[in-house]
Amino acid sequence: MAFQKQVNKTQALGSAGQISKAFHNYCNTFSAVATDENVCVGCFVQAGDKDGEVKGASGQAITTEILGVVVKDKYISSNGTEAVHIYREGDNVTILNAGNIFIEVEAEATQGQYVHLVKATGALSFYDEIDTSGDKVY
């Protein structure tokens, strides 16, 4: 998979779930069906129980393969009580599995660090080295 795995210093401005074309225009996406409430724009997803399904990976235990990040590919209102960037179960979603995409996190990263998800919790973290312990993915 040719997915961005390191933090870039000169990333263009953008919002979570937006594909970044700051370095090149190559990217690859595929469609899937959300199967839980943890599938949201700009978040990592893992394979669901059935072919063509995905479930959230951010903030929960990772039990299957990480497939990519959910793309913001349609208008989602930011007004009113229905303003959510979370997809409901059964919604169609687009997943980026190659290229650069914006994610939004509380953690601070520096240029060149690697992006990891902790398998037990789904927490996103940044490290200077690729994890070899098997406790993290990506």
Region spans (language model):
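Surface-exposed, low-hydrophobicity beta-strand/loop segments enriched in small/polar/acidic residues
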Residues: 1-138
